[in-house]
Every structure is written in C-alpha cells, then in structure tokens.
Amino acid sequence: MLSPKRVKFRKQQRGRMRGVATRGNTIAFGQFALQAQECGWITSRQIEASRRAMTRYVKRGGKIWIRIFPDKPVTMRPAETRMGSGKGNPEFWVAVIKPGRILFEMGGEEITPEIAKEAMRLAQYKLPLKTKFICLDEQEQPAGTKAAASSTVES
C-alpha cells in the first residue's frame, strides 16, 4: 500500500476541504480518466483496492496511472481511553481529494472506451466519493486555454 517513506512531522491536523482542485484536474498521461465529483479522503487501502480491480479487468492490455498519493497521516486513540494524554498515533494514510481531481488514468493500444469505462466502474465501487468517467477528446479545457484558443480562431 502507498505511504510516504519519511515525513518531516509524524502528525497533522485534520484540516478543511474547501474549493475545487486547481492542480491535477486534467488528463496528463492516458486517454481515459476517473475524476472526483466531491471532496473527501481516500485511504491507501481504497486506492490499492481500486487499482487491483482495474488491473484485474484490463489484464495486460493497457497501462494505469495513479494520480493521487496518500500523504496525510490520520491518528487514532485506543478504544476506551480517558480524555487527555495527547494525540493518538498515526494509524493510516489518506489522500485529500477536492472536486475535479483526476484519480486514475488509463491508456494503451488495446484499451477501448468500453473496456476503460467498465474498469473505471469497478474502481468506482471501491471509492467513498462520487466520480465520473472522462475521455481525453471530450475533456473540457481550463478557462485560460479556452479563451486563448477562441481568440486565435477569430483572428
């Protein structure tokens, strides 16, 4: 399972998830992708379960890229422990996900849109967030590039 090799600080505060993903929100490697529709945490176990489901379905036909990494430690206290005596120990790692973030990408010579969609659907079942399947050719352009493209067409 995914986790950082070493971190500067063992424990982090939980934080807030506000706004949409400004980075990692476009397809960069493959032709098909799974994009988050809502915010939340995805654990390293959920990422691994999704990866296995997709890999098992496509077999050796294509390549899968994982675009998220669990770099936030979540601490927990032992059950039936009295209040006080400090913060608990890190138990597992999560990736903080905002809407619009690309979670997985898939590509390859033998990967058709139908195969990719079914593999991503199997991965969706393992995740705690709403997600959608997107293709490279039907992906919306970021705001700045759309304006630049339309201005070059008019001139």
From Swiss-Prot:
The cross-references to Gene3D superfamilies, in alphabetical order and at most eight, read: Ribosomal protein L10e/L16
- InterPro entries annotated for this entry? Ribosomal_uL16, Ribosomal_uL16_bact-type, Ribosomal_uL16_CS, Ribosomal_uL16_dom, Ribosomal_uL16_sf
Pfam families of this UniProt entry? Ribosomal_L16
Q: Which GO terms describe its cellular component?
A: ribonucleoprotein complex; ribosome
Task: Give any GO molecular function from the UniProt entry.
Answer: structural constituent of ribosome
Per UniProt, subunit arrangement is: Part of the 50S ribosomal subunit.
Family statement drawn from the similarity comment of this UniProt entry? Belongs to the universal ribosomal protein uL16 family.
**Function, as annotated:** Binds 23S rRNA and is also seen to make contacts with the A and possibly P site tRNAs.
Q: What is this protein called?
A: Large ribosomal subunit protein uL16
- Source organism of this protein record: Synechococcus sp. (strain CC9311)
